[in-house]
C-alpha cells in the first residue's frame, strides 16, 4: 500500500527553505561573520537583525533534520540497504560534491558553505543504514508527545549543548575527517534527526493531540519573543549565559508546534504548493550562488539595508525555485534534484 502523501511536511519544508534564503539574505546587512559579500556602503546595516539570525538558528536546521529523519525508516524498509544507500549517494552526494566543488573554486580554498547540511544529512543516513544492517527496527509503541516529554528532550539537548559550548562556542566550525560541522549545534542536529526517526516509528506526528501541539507552539512563540526582547540588561545576560539550554527548548517547542500547526492548517495540496515542494531541495542548493551574484550586482544601488534585505530575499527565492524547475527538465536530473 502506498503511503499517503504528507503535504503538510512538504509545505513546511518549502517555508523553511524560504526562511533559510532570507536568513542568508540578511547576513550581509547584519553581523555577516564569514559571509562572502560585504556592502561597500557602511550605512547598509541592520543592527537589530541578529535577533532574526539567533531565533532562526535556534530551530530551523534542527527542524530540517527532524523532517529528513522522519522519512528515513520507511524509505530504508521499502528499498533495502543497497538501494537506500545508492539513492542517498545520488541525491545527497552528487549535489554536495558539485556545489561544494564550485564553492571551493570560487573561494580559493576548501569550502562547503550551506552544503554542510546536505553533507551531514548524507552522513546521518549512512550511519542509520549501517546500524540497520545489524539491528532490527524499533518496534512501535503507544507513546505520544507530551509537554513534559518535550521539555525533557529540550532540557537534555540544552544541558549537553551548554557544556559543549564551554569548549566550542557558537559559530565555531570544525573540519574533521571530511565532515564540516559546528559543535555548538551538532547535538541538536543529531537529536532532531533521531527524533524524526522515532516520530516515524511511533507515529508521533499523527498522535500529537491538538492541545499539546497548540501549547508547544505557544511556548515556542513566548521563547522566541523572549529572544527578540534581549537588548542589554539582566534579561539579556541571563539568556546569554544559559543560551544553550534556552535555545534547545526553543528548538523543540517551536519545531513540534510548527509540525502541529501545518498538520492542522497547512496541509495544502494545490498545484502551486506541489510545484514549490518539488523545487525546494534544489532551491536550497542553488540559492547561495545566485544570492552572492545579485548582492554584488546591486552593491551600488541604494535601497536602504532593509530594502536590500527584502529585495534580495524575494528575488533569490523566486530565482532559486525557477532555476531548479528549469534544471530539473534536463533528463535524469530529477533523480538528483
Model-derived features: where do they sit?
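Alpha-helical transmembrane segments and their immediate juxtamembrane cytosolic regions
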Residues: 1-337
